[in-house]
UniProtKB/Swiss-Prot annotation:
This is Testis-expressed protein 9. It is found in: Cytoplasm, Cytoskeleton, Microtubule organizing center, Centrosome, Centriolar satellite. It comes from the Eukaryota. Residues 1-31, 65-85 are annotated as: Disordered. Keywords: Coiled coil, Cytoplasm, Cytoskeleton. The keyword RNA-binding does not apply. The keyword Disulfide bond does not apply. One of its GO terms (cellular component) is centriolar satellite. It comes from Homo sapiens. Residues 188-351 form a coiled coil. Its main location: cytoplasm.
Amino acid sequence: MAGRSLCLTRSSVPGTPFPPPVQQPSTPGPDLLALEEEYKRLNAELQAKTADVVQQAKEIIRDRQEVRSRPVSTQMKSCDDEDDYSLRGLLPSEGIVHLHSETKPKTKNIDPVNKVQNKLHSANKGRKTNSSVKLKYSDVQTADDVAIPEDFSDFSLAKTISKIEGQLEEEGLPEYIDDIFSGVSNDIGTEAQIRFLKAKLHVMQEELDNVVCECNKKEDEIQNLKSQVKNFEEDFMRQQRTINMQQSQVEKYKTLFEEANKKYDGLQQQLSSVERELENKRRLQKQAASSQSATEVRLNRALEEAEKYKLELSKLRQNNKDIANEEHKKIEVLKSENKKLEKQKGELMIGFKKQLKLIDVLKRQKMHIEAAKMLSFTEEEFMKALEWGNS
């Protein structure tokens, strides 16, 4: 059972998938934390599977040691002892002779019935004891060696009785026949003695049938025990093959465990490097966060100033528009005034030219007057000069 559960629980160990190498992100984020959690989870799974494999390997080794320390012969020892005891009880060294010897008184002479019994069982005595020894020390044996001897297979009560009657008719009763009937009257005839011997043989035949029946039962039990021994041997061979296979699997799992330990060490190193990188990234992230907060503060201030400047710029643009409108109006006014002034200038220039002409005329007149004064011009010349000046 332990081997089957081991095969079921370890089939997932060789193909345990490892996470593919994750590319390091350009910026620190939650991927590193997820990778760290994944490595921790894989570490816990590897430790649990390792403990399970080691425990099951110990159980398999312990079961194998128990099976090796307890061979099949010791497992069947109790059954063999019981069978040997029953067979020894049924087939003792004294045999059936001892059972029937109690029915007659002890005499110094030899009973001819006991001779017949000894003839029937002396050849089988060694076989019965040997068969009991074979049952005790042998794993494979035939039922004929234990159950029924070879001489019993051809035994028949009628043949035995006819044989004894023939011997009695030919030879007569032996001299020591009286020892058989020591407790019976000497007046018993030959027929009565024969009937007595027939009855005794009938009892012996019944007892022999009982013994044969018991032997048949024991033979069936021995066959059952043989089949059990065979099943036990097959089971032992299967268990041995299973143990060998499981030992190879244990070796394979040991190598896989060593490889997993190496991978675990590599993953631990990767995890430590990733943790260091994560710490560096966290420190850089904190620095970036602090600088980002300062930048955001400056940016907010700059945005506020930009908003202020936008408002001021809009105000300035509005003021410039107003000023431009006013200037435009002023320019228009100035243009109109300039036109007026130009017109006045033109008029003044015309007047000035006329005044210059008048001045020239007056100068000429003055010169003429002075010349007239000096030269005493005549009135006519003066009038000409005036006319010339008016023209």
